[in-house]
Amino acid sequence: MEQVIWDKIYFGDSINDCAPQKQFGHILHILCMEGSMSFVFHDVRYNIAKGDYVILPNRSLACSFSESSDFDAIIMSLSESFVTSMALRSNYGIIGHLSLLQNPVMRLSENDFRKCRTDMSRLRERLNDREHLFREEMLGHLLLAHILDLYDIHARGRKPEPIPERAISLLRQFIEMLYLISKLYSMSGRHSARSVYM
């Protein structure tokens, strides 16, 4: 399938299309459609199968990807700055972000799987609509709907405690600082991204 490239949303056919050096500042989403895949994230090996949804907030923290011969997935890379520029009133993003740093895999129900597959397929299809006069805003709203679906799926699996607005802001700034430090270290070649978090 042809790759669709835009600086804010990118779809690839393989995990190799999303190399960490090309994807800094991007969040990687993988919806497994068939087969299986494994990878290492924070020294833990994860094995995913059909119906699993992976969100890697920082692609450089994952390695040792391997796919089964029948592996098929929707692989989407999102510009973090594009996502944060959208007017989300919910603060769930920071809760989900911290949780994903601990475990980036969500096991979906059949209904949630269909919903995510439809959302992502629609985004990929509309990404090709280059003549749309309000393309960026239209894609932003489609993406926003998908993100809110993901918040709902993730939140149903846990009972989050309310977090004050100031704490959310400080956590967001702290995470951004860690990513910047990680990028600087990886560019210098002296340290692995993992060492920044130790």
What are these regions (language model features)?
Residues N16-F24, S64-E67, L108, P162:
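Short histidine-centered beta-strand/loop micro-motifs
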Residues E67-D129:
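A hydrophobic/aromatic-rich effector-binding and dimerization subdomain
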Residues S38-V40, L61-S68:
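Short beta-strand His + acidic residue motifs that chelate non-heme Fe in jelly-roll/DSBH
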Residues L108, R130-M138, L150-R190, R194:
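Short, Lys/Arg-enriched, Trp-marked, Pro/Gly-tolerant hinge/linker segments that flank
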Residues I48-L61, S77:
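Conserved metal-binding segment of the jelly-roll/cupin
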Residues M1-D52:
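Generic protein-terminus/edge-of-domain signal
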